[in-house]
């Protein structure tokens, strides 16, 4: 009966053992395919993760988060880079790192991230932005020399810096600038007429000391206007400057542990501060006794601002101090290097003398003549490019920024290595002293001897007038003959806060020979 019932359905009879075996075989076959699928899926996932990692690394380097420079190495890198700055000086260390790592480098000074820039576009970016109007330096060091939130040079209180800068701008432009030429000529001639007290037994003159005396006298006549002892004041300025570059980036522990050195530095700085305070008091008495004020100079303007409560006594003193010291240790040394370069390049000296004769034509030097000294101006610019006294400037970022694709965080220190930037391939002969480098107009982004932007040197126009007038007056009367073999490259120099000659008589003494005696 069962057979009858099943027959219409067309079903076959199958043994149970065969059915089970077939099922197991099919399961085993499906399992092998599943294992292969799992392996392929895992490999695909790993490849995808690797691709994502490579893309992340590429993005990281494309965004330039990693600035070239020494490695961190658990804090050893920051320590070693800071020691190099302390040991060799800021200028020398900056040149070392730019030479080793390129034109944008990250180092550390006192544990703070610091960028050293010598690429012209990066330097120009920083100079022109108000984001970088602050400077960096040791707070205790700046307090030691009276520059912390006072004066103009290292004052990082931007609001107060802007206020005092207006006094400098007024003194260094307008009527003050118009008086500069006459005062420079008078002062230079006066000192050249009285060379005997600067001559040694061989009849040679300490030319750097002569230039410093001329420049400090000019500064006094322009900005202070009281009797002073030039040599005594210059000695105090020299000690103040040494203290300045010694304490500028020292760590706080230096001032606490090396208290005897701190006391010495404070005493050296205080000597000049007291001398300036005494000169300001002389000026105050002079103003009190004056029946009328024909023209107020820089110090008089500051004294009146103090009397109206606009400035503190300490800030007035620091402003006058910085105005008086600025030229003797920058402009006078620049002139010293220029005189050496002239003797190294007699063809350039001859061209300048011929230009002087053509422009002056036997007449006294006047303002109208200055624009005619094209060769002289090219010589001054090339000297400032080839061997600058101040070859870097220090800034601090007031907010986050991006420089050449690199992220810069707020508070990052910036060193603009302008001296190295001036050796760029833009100039026809970047590593040579040649007037060909200024045969054509040079865009400001490639040549920044006085900086640019909101914190540029406020006295750059007056500095050019002073250099031209002093050089023309000196060269029209004397030929400057250094000791044989004395060149810009051969004399010992330091490069910390600025490039300065080591003051040895053998390298600073020159023979001044009258032109009409040649």
Curated annotation (Swiss-Prot):
Instruction: Tell me which UniProt keywords the record has, alphabetically.
Output: Heme, Iron, Membrane, Metal-binding, Monooxygenase, Oxidoreductase
Q: Which cofactor does it need?
A: heme
* Entry EC no(s): 1.14.14.14
Q: Is Ribosomal protein among this UniProt entry's keywords? A: no
Q: In which tissues is it expressed?
A: Ovarian specific.
Listed under catalytic activity are:
testosterone + 3 reduced [NADPH--hemoprotein reductase] + 3 O2 = 17beta-estradiol + formate + 3 oxidized [NADPH--hemoprotein reductase] + 4 H2O + 4 H(+); androst-4-ene-3,17-dione + 3 reduced [NADPH--hemoprotein reductase] + 3 O2 = estrone + formate + 3 oxidized [NADPH--hemoprotein reductase] + 4 H2O + 4 H(+)
Write out the residues that bind heme.
Answer: 457
- Membrane topology designation: Peripheral membrane protein
Q: Which GO terms describe its molecular function?
A: aromatase activity; heme binding; iron ion binding
GO annotation, biological process? female gonad development; response to estradiol
Q: Which InterPro entries match?
A: Cyt_P450, Cyt_P450_CS, Cyt_P450_E_grp-I, Cyt_P450_sf, Cytochrome_P450_Monoox
List the GO cellular component terms.
Answer: endoplasmic reticulum; membrane
The protein's location, in the record's own words, is:
Membrane
The record's similarity note reads: Belongs to the cytochrome P450 family.
Q: Could you tell me what this protein does?
A: Catalyzes the formation of aromatic C18 estrogens from C19 androgens.
Entry protein name: Ovarian aromatase
- Organism equals Carassius auratus (Goldfish)
